[in-house]
Amino acid sequence: MQDDLLMDKSKAQQRQQPQQPPSSQTQQQQKEAASVAEPPSSRESSPPTHKDKMQMESPLLPGLSFQQEPPTTPSLSPSFGSTWSTGGSNSAVDDSFFPGITPVNGTMLFQNFPHHHHVNPVFGGTFSPQMGLAHQTQQQQRRSPASPNNHTAYTQRNAYSHQPILTNKPSSSPNSSSPSPSNWNNQQNAAWNTPSNPWGAMQPGRDPRRAVGVGVGVGVGVPSPLNPISPLKKTFSSNVIAPPKFSRASPLTPKSWVEDNAFRTDNGNTLLPLQDRNRPYDSFNLHTLENSLMDMIRTDHEPLKARMGLNFHHPGTDNIMALNTRSYGRRRGRSSLFPFEDGFLGDGHGDQSLSSGLSSPTHCQNGERIERYSRKVFVGGLPPDIDEDEITASFRRFGPLVVDWPHKAESKSYFPPKGYAFLLFQEESSVQALIDACLEEDGKLYLCVSSPTIKDKPVQIRPWNLSDSDFVMDGSQPLDPRKTIFVGGVPRPLRAVELAMIMDRLYGGVCYAGIDTDPELKYPKGAGRVAFSNQQSYIAAISARFVQLQHNDIDKRVEVKPYVLDDQMCDECQGTRCGGKFAPFFCANVTCLQYYCEYCWASIHSRAGREFHKPLVKEGGDRPRHVPFHWS
């Protein structure tokens, strides 16, 4: 009888066993393997498995499944259960999975997870992959019991390469057991330790901005500028906002904000993350704002360079006109984010008594040194009891120099008569060093100088920028020497651009202005030239004879004369009467305005009404002067 009962019971068990799903066998094998790998302490703290537990699978991690107690109260569909936490206070899952990351309602954002056909339909393919870590009170199962084979589960796990952040930190909650790390970590550690893995070199002490792309897009050091998993990520709206920055468990090593390789464009750039410009704007990805600000800093300077038109000249370009015209760029306050020629920054507006390149080094072009300043520097406001030797001692640290002032040889005095002097440096680089040592106030440069009775008296330093010697206002007009005037007595601080603006305001039609400089030191000589584009403006200027120059502190009455050339032929005989020689005389009267040789001058000006005209001749320094004509 007992044998019959045992046989009937075994047959009944055999009939029930095929009805069990294959997932139960897989689950039983998984439990046995996990129990073997777990330490005794973990097995003791694990609660017994209840037969009514409900199997659940992560909507985003098909290879990651777990069990959950069946809900006792009405709730949302299981598709939402993986996104929001159940309200439990279990911190073991968070601490053991991603230490140091502050979860938002129990969830975290993952932008590097691939889309999968098992993704929950709530999210869909157009949403950024997210993983909601629900707080569980039961042991988590790392493999899906419904997986067709074991190889697929391990393949899917290997795709999620985030193991540097995953740790095997034991659970601190008595209500949860440590997720058996044996199968998971053993599969991942081998992949993370390979040299070909680009993420394996991440160190715990690095800047969190350079961390793996968790919530902040693609991380730094990715071999491709695009996301290798989801290159064309679409705009999405989500109820989960992950913090773009997070604190790490390990201490951060102090690092400079701007590094030497900050502006590298290769994969070695560790400061500026690669940014996908083809991706639509992501309102929840705050990291794009940080990248945009950094891109603004390292953007090229083409918009500023575009301000240089025909009216400007750069030392590396061809001359705009026959004259060696140069830009009139500002000379002070050169910025480190824009390291190019200061001529690009000139705009002819506002106070430009100082230019923007004073502290910049000497430029070199094609191996040749390009000078920016005159070697002659004006120094004003000197102490009255300072002599030549003391002035030399005060400025010798910038380089060899000679101290000079007007009529020094005739006066035989060791003291500057009017409190100013000129410093003649041997090298132009000494002038730049002097400028760098000065203090700027109200657009002027000052340096403290001491005398026997006065200690640290500020004196004004006024260098001359070579780019201020010429200014082209209208580059489309050709320069006509016969429409050019000479301006005598120009104050030395006045620049070419300021002279052009004054003359254009008075007479109009100015196309060029220049300041005469000596050929050796290239310092202003106190005269200038202005070329007009039409005859009316030219005649109006020479007819006035005197002009009041007013600009800032400058207010001086200067003389205006026609600009006389010494290589012009006679306008009457074209050299036939004078043997082909150049005409020595120019008549500045508005009825003539011509060059004459001696024979033609006598012939033309013997007529009634012209006998009182005085010829102009060119003398040294481009200065025309009236000479009496000796009638024969």
Curated annotation (Swiss-Prot):
UniProt KW keywords: Activator, Cell projection, Cytoplasm, Developmental protein, Differentiation, Nucleus, Repeat, Repressor, RNA-binding, Synapse
UniProt feature, compositional bias: Polar residues: 65-89, 135-169
Gene3D superfamilies according to UniProt: 3.30.70.330, Cytoplasmic polyadenylation element-binding protein, ZZ domain
Signal sequence, start to end: none
Protein name stated in the entry: Cytoplasmic polyadenylation element-binding protein 3
Organism: Xenopus tropicalis (Western clawed frog)
PROSITE patterns named among the record's database cross-references: RRM (PS50102)
Family: Belongs to the RRM CPEB family.
Cellular component, GO annotation: apical dendrite; CCR4-NOT complex; cytoplasm; dendrite; neuron projection; nucleus; postsynaptic density; synapse
GO molecular function, one term: mRNA 3'-UTR AU-rich region binding
SMART domains, A to Z: RRM
Its biological purpose: Sequence-specific RNA-binding protein which acts as a translational repressor in the basal unstimulated state but, following neuronal stimulation, acts as a translational activator. Does not bind to the cytoplasmic polyadenylation element (CPE), a uridine-rich sequence element within the mRNA 3'-UTR, but binds to a U-rich loop within a stem-loop structure. Required for the consolidation and maintenance of hippocampal-based long term memory. Inhibits differentiation of intermediate mesoderm from an early stage to inhibit pronephric differentiation but induce neural differentiation.
Compositional bias ranges of the Basic and acidic residues kind: 1-11
Keyword Repeat: yes
Tissue specificity as recorded in UniProt: In embryos, expressed in the central nervous system, and intermediate and distal pronephric tubule segments of the embryonic kidney.
Pfam families: CEBP_ZZ, RRM_7
Subunit structure, interactors included: Following synaptic activity, forms amyloid-like oligomers. Aggregation requires an intact actin cytoskeleton.
Segments of this protein annotated with the region Disordered: 1-89, 127-212
Subcellular location: Cytoplasm; Nucleus; Synapse; Cell projection, Dendrite
UniProt record, GO biological process: 3'-UTR-mediated mRNA destabilization; cell differentiation; cellular response to amino acid stimulus; long-term memory; negative regulation of cytoplasmic translational elongation; negative regulation of transcription by RNA polymerase II; negative regulation of translation; positive regulation of dendritic spine development
